[in-house]
Amino acid sequence: MNSNVISSALKKLRKEYGLTQVDLAMKSGVGLNSVRELEQGKATVRMDKVAQVFDLFGYELVPQKKVK
């Protein structure tokens, strides 16, 4: 999964739930800068932060074999 997929999914979920980036940071316990970096598609974000944010929406990150 590349950073653009994560970024797009996070933005979509946040907007569907009517949350601002500040709201998302507060509710997930992740810093605002981390939320912004995730939504900007920064490739070097920490996986624990990604997992923490998606957990708020009921998602978990799991390894999945690539389809060739």
Predicted feature residues:
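A detector for short, charged/polar N-terminal pre-domain segments
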Residues: M1-V5
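Short basic helix-loop element that most often maps to the first helix and adjoining turn
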Residues: S8-D23, Q52
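Short alpha-helical DNA-recognition segment
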Residues: L19-S34
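DNA major-groove recognition helix of helix-turn-helix/homeodomain DNA-binding modules
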Residues: D48-P63
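Short, charged recognition helix plus adjacent turn
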Residues: A43-T44, V62-K68
